């Protein structure tokens, strides 16, 4: 071998090895198994998702995935515009390429169900019963037995309000009870965090009271901007031992007896949930409450308002005194100018 050839070999070989090593590294990453924290991880891909946003969702779910690498892989494979929305499962052994191809094919092996903020237990049960991919077992379990299993608070008197409103992804054949257990665990975690972050002077005595008040706030709030202020009204009333006088609790107490329009006789009809006839909070939540309602219940706006009324556009008018409130009622409910 000539001196020139030796020189060329010394110069070129490291480059070849470097390129080859890099190619091997890329190949192993593209086809190698992802590190999952559990046997499977559920991912909900919203409509309009990009490879970048999907990679971020995967990372948030506890699965390390290089965002730039995933984006490059999608573009090189011309799969970036083919990704379909839906619920997907990542299982042990899946590689970045496997996940990407599954989403491009729309291989939605998982199903999903959504519990909406403000739904009551009856509505949640109906959603579960109407889902074709959920195993129906609730008929075999009494509410009392289910409450024993799910009452992590130790103070709940009913199942109402124990299930966090969210979208849950699950494999076909998951039972309704399993989904309720999952929603209850989620609610407990979120409630624990909200309780830990409560205002130091909160009028609420325990997390269950927070869940009860949050459910009322959830039903009373028409616009998000009013949520903390509405929470402040109820906190002020509780603090001075004033009737809460909130219609949603009355409606809940009427149950199937509610005709769709609240009448004066309904407000006078005493039930454990009638906050026009009974002081304090009702015995249980009246609906499922989201994060924002819980945060408002535990960190209400500080003010002197004791009254509020809906303006008819989703927002509310607030008042400190009853005469001021009556003017607001005349303006927004009775249609009279002040």
Please identify what each model-predicted range represents.
Residues 9-13, 40, 81-82, 119-123, ...:
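Short low-complexity stretches enriched in small and charged residues
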Residues 1-7:
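Short, Lys/Arg-rich N-terminal segment immediately upstream of the first membrane anchor
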Residues 22, 27-191:
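Signal peptide-directed extracytoplasmic domains
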Residues 50, 126, 130-135, 149-338:
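Bacterial extracytoplasmic/cell-wall-associated proteins, especially those involved in peptidoglycan
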